[in-house]
Each structure stands twice: as C-alpha cells, then as structure tokens.
Amino acid sequence: MATKVKFKYKGEEKEVDISKIKKVWRVGKMISFTYDDNGKTGRGAVSEKDAPKELLEKLK
C-alpha cells in the first residue's frame, strides 16, 4: 500500500501519494516538499512530528 502524506495548504486539507513527491527539504521544524499535481508542481509542508518516515527518508 502506498503511503500518503496529509497536509494543509492555504487552509485546504490535501493528501498526496509519496511516489508523486519530487523534492523534499527542511525549514526549521517543518518538512516542505514539491509534488507532481497532474502535470503542475504542487507545494506542501508538514510538521516533522507528523511526517511519515518515508517522507523523512527522502531528505537524505
């Protein structure tokens, strides 16, 4: 089963499959990322404590 990352962006609850995530970086205690949103680049962020371990592994 594919891991999903749940996050809020501009007040809207969103969820993205971890396989669509392109780039991951740390900003303080937040993990920011970009993902493929049907051909467009989407952005998201999640707190480090709420991030799935698969997302944290992409930081390395």
Curated annotation (Swiss-Prot):
Its main location: cytoplasm. Pfam families: 7kD_DNA_binding (PF02294). The keyword Lyase does not apply. It is found in: Cytoplasm. GO terms for molecular function: DNA binding; RNA endonuclease activity. Keywords: Cytoplasm, DNA-binding. GO terms for cellular component: cytoplasm. InterPro entries: Chromo-like_dom_sf, DNA-bd_7a-e_arc. Residues 37-60 are annotated as: Disordered. Highly stable from pH 0 to pH 12. Residues 46-60 have a biased composition (Basic and acidic residues). Hyperthermostable. The keyword DNA-binding applies. Belongs to the 7 kDa DNA-binding/endoribonuclease P2 family. Can constrain negative DNA supercoils. May be involved in maintaining the integrity of the genome at high temperature. Monomer. NCBIfam families: Sul7d. This is DNA-binding protein 7c. It comes from Acidianus hospitalis (strain W1).
